[in-house]
């Protein structure tokens, strides 16, 4: 039964991820003019990269963490809803997609409080990069729906009842990644997955196109996202001063202990890099194909 549920969840994740990349590529004119077969190939390749990230594989095979499996399935739904909300001209559809985004954000916050706050941060980054004031509002409303999670946190951290959480005050600084661990092809230390060879290959290819081929790939919005990725990655390292943060007071000691491991932040950095990589590589491939077709026509 569990295996059947696992297969169903991954099939649903494949579908939601395909919808996410379809929404992203709809902003690209070259994608709109492609045949259904080519569109499907691009979407399938991007979805498989998302599903094959080692941190996702670890949640399925090693830990069998249903909370993380659910979050990986819901994140593409959230991204799709946010993008579609800005594209549709009908007010009813805008409100509908906005409501879906709020609900999904709330569900993620109820499933995992740390994930909920990280997603709120990324939604605000999306609002800055796309210049959409609605995004932070949606993020705040969605986080508000998860208020039972954070009321429980308050009871544990502020009211001095941390023992009821079933956790202990711990230092998480030594649980972070080393620099080399970020680039490991699969598992690093303590079972923490690196970014994997597929994502690393995509990033190397984009660096090659930028610095060797001289392509202008990066935009101003991408810079905002890369800064967010850099911050999340730094927070996941064993060099980030989590011990100093914990010394700020009893509340900070409890809050950091609830995080349990800083490697969680690199998970979301990888997701952002995955989405950006698929978008850029797909755009490059479609642009080259269009140029070849134009040359043949001439």
Task: Give the ranges of each region predicted by the language model.
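Membrane-embedded transmembrane-helix bundle of lipid-linked glycan/lipid transferases
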Residues: 1-298
């Amino acid at each position: 039964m569990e295996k059947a549920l696992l297969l169903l969840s991954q099939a649903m994740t494949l579908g939601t991820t395909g919808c996410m990349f379809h929404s992203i590529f709809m902003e690209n004119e070259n994608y709109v003019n492609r045949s259904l077969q080519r569109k499907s190939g691009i979407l399938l390749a991007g979805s498989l990269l998302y599903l094959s990230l080692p941190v996702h594989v670890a949640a399925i095979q090693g830990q069998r963490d249903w909370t993380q499996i659910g979050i990986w399935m819901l994140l593409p739904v959230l991204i799709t809803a946010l993008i579609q909300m800005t594209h549709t001209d009908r007010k009813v559809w805008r409100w509908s997609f906005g409501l879906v985004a709020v609900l999904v954000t709330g569900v993620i916050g109820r499933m995992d409080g740390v994930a909920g706050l990280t997603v709120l941060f990324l939604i605000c980054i999306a609002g800055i990069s796309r210049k959409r004031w609605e995004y932070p509002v949606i993020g705040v409303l969605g986080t508000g729906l998860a208020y039972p999670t954070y009321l429980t946190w308050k009871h544990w951290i502020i009211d001095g009842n941390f023992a009821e959480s079933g956790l202990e005050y711990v230092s998480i600084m030594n649980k972070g990644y080393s620099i080399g661990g970020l680039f490991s092809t699969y598992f690093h230390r303590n079972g923490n997955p690196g970014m994997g060879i597929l994502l690393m290959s995509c990033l190397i290819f984009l660096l090659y196109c930028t610095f060797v081929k001289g392509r202008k790939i990066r935009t101003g919005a991408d810079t905002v996202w890369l800064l967010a990725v850099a911050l999340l990655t730094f927070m996941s390292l064993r060099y980030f001063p989590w011990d100093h943060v914990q010394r700020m007071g009893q509340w900070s000691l409890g809050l950091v202990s609830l995080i349990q491991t800083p490697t969680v932040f690199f998970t979301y950095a990888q997701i952002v890099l995955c989405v950006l990589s698929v978008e850029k590589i797909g755009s490059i491939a479609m642009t080259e194909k269009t140029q070849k077709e134009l040359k043949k026509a001439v």
